[in-house]
Amino acid sequence: DDETTFPCNSGRCACLPEDSHSYTCQSP
């Protein structure tokens, strides 16, 4: 889901690995 996942270099938030190929954007 592009609205809730971003590459780790997004910079807008802390990106936590959700699985082997996606990341969840979480406010720091």
Swiss-Prot record:
The cysteine framework is IX (C-C-C-C-C-C). The keyword Nucleus does not apply. Disulfide bonds: none annotated. Its main location: secreted. It is found in: Secreted. Keywords: Disulfide bond, Hydroxylation, Neurotoxin, Secreted, Toxin. Contains 3 disulfide bonds. One of its GO terms (cellular component) is extracellular region. The modification 4-hydroxyproline is found at P17, P28. The keyword Nuclease does not apply. This is Conotoxin Cl9b. It comes from Californiconus californicus. Expressed by the venom duct. One of its GO terms (molecular function) is toxin activity.
